[in-house]
Amino acid sequence: MTQTARVKLTSTSLPKLDGVCGEIMGIGKKTGVKVKGPTPLPVKRLHVATRKSPCGNGTETYEKWEMKMHRRIININADDKAIRQLMRLKIPDDVYIELSLT
């Protein structure tokens, strides 16, 4: 019986995220299972504005910092062999993966 595995990927580095997506798609092609995705989700943007002057005097000038969180979803009709290969996948430190079976 095949199960559907939903893989959620999150990263601040878009090239590393796309690399992991490509590896997962390659596993799907090798094992011959049906793969849907990668579906891009909206980018989360975290903004932080800080005053440049540490003492509080002078003109109000601000530095603006932004961090983008890129997300992807891949659905795989996975059998045991495909799931084992997903578990062995080498994932970079700044790519977070969440795997749920339904």
UniProtKB/Swiss-Prot annotation:
Chain's role: Involved in the binding of tRNA to the ribosomes.
Entry's Gene Ontology cellular component terms: cytosolic small ribosomal subunit
Biological processes annotated in GO: translation
Keywords: Ribonucleoprotein, Ribosomal protein
Organism lineage: Archaea, Nitrososphaerota, Nitrososphaeria, Nitrosopumilales, Nitrosopumilaceae
Pfam families: Ribosomal_S10
GO MF annotation terms: structural constituent of ribosome; tRNA binding
Protein name: Small ribosomal subunit protein uS10
Family under the similarity heading: Belongs to the universal ribosomal protein uS10 family.
Cross-referenced PANTHER family: 30S RIBOSOMAL PROTEIN S10 FAMILY MEMBER (PTHR11700)
Source taxon at top rank: Archaea
Assembly and binders: Part of the 30S ribosomal subunit.
Membrane-traversing stretches: none
